[in-house]
């Protein structure tokens, strides 16, 4: 699943540890052995098929602004669709499963630096707090450096098996709406 977005000053979701975080919410409908997440900024001329395009991306897709990506994969304590209410999501407990800053496996940014991010997380079935089970996850992203996060970004989430029913969105109300369809 590919998501194209635009991060800008003032539209962050949370300030945590002095950094402005933005979140993409991810519903995983089945047990997964592994998840991969990659993020790059800017999107530039990347060729992407069937991507989810946010309204902010559409409005700013020609922007040349980019940022040094830093990503986290976090799991909530919401394990079923019935628990995915606005109130529950807003007060959910989040456990960071993995994080990544700079990856040499990703394309360089326009400055020629390896400041794009890639992480792979393998489910740890022997530990219920680290297993990739059905439920609500989020991808947190910010910049490693202090300062504002601004620019287009491409986020891709994948698994080694087909997971029909995966939902990726920045908007919690859209997530709830899609879960209830």
Positions of PLM-derived features:
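Surface-exposed coil/turn segments at beta-strand junctions on protein surfaces, enriched
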Residues: 17, 30, 130-134
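A near-ubiquitous, low-amplitude feature marking generic local secondary-structure context
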Residues: 9-11, 20, 76
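C-terminal edge strands of extracellular/lumenal beta-sandwich accessory domains
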Residues: 24-25, 45-181
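Short, well-ordered helical secondary-structure segments
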Residues: 13-15, 19, 58, 126
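Extended extracellular/luminal ectodomain segments enriched in beta-structured repeat modules
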Residues: 19-21, 28-36
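A short beta-strand element within beta-rich, extracytoplasmic domains
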Residues: 33-43, 54-57
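N-terminal leader/pro-regions and domain N-caps
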Residues: 1-16
């Amino acid at each position: 699943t590919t998501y194209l977005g635009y991060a800008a000053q003032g539209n962050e979701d949370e300030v945590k540890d002095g950094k402005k975080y933005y979140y993409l919410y991810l519903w995983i409908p089945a047990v997964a052995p592994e998840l991969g997440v990659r993020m790059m900024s800017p999107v530039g001329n990347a060729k992407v098929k069937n991507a989810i395009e946010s309204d902010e991306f559409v409005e700013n897709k020609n922007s040349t602004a980019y940022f040094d990506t830093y990503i986290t994969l976090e799991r909530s304590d919401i394990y079923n669709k019935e628990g995915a209410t606005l109130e529950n999501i807003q007060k959910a407990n989040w456990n960071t499963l993995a994080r990544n800053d700079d990856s040499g496996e990703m394309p360089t940014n326009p400055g020629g630096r390896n400041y794009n991010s890639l992480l792979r997380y393998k489910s740890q079935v022997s530990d219920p707090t680290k297993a990739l089970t059905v439920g609500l996850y989020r991808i947190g992203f910010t910049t490693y450096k202090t300062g504002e996060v601004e620019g287009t970004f491409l986020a891709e989430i994948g698994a080694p098996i087909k997971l029909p029913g995966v939902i990726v969105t920045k908007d919690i109300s859209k997530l709830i709406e899609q879960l209830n369809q």
